[in-house]
Amino acid sequence: MHANDIVLFSQVVELGSFKKAAELNNITNSVVSKRITQLEQALNAQLLYRTTRSLALTEAGKKLASSADMIKHITQEAIDDIKD
């Protein structure tokens, strides 16, 4: 499990789709799906209920989502500080 996978999970949740998160990161939908699946396996918990048209957070996903959002913002702040 990598911090960037948690950030990617946060983006999927925020954007509501694998496709939009893939476009944001210049990667394919299948890469997003694979990384989220690997994150779920590492945590031994399903994070998302997936259908062909929608995503919904599981209870474990809800718990991770709030922490993941903080991690995403802290990471972005660190990057911005370095660039300044």
Positions of predicted regions on the chain:
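Short helix-boundary/capping micro-motifs
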Residues: Q11-N26
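Short helix-loop hinge/linker segments at domain boundaries
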Residues: R53-L55, H73-D84
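Alpha-helical residues within the helix-turn-helix
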Residues: E23-L24, Q41, K62
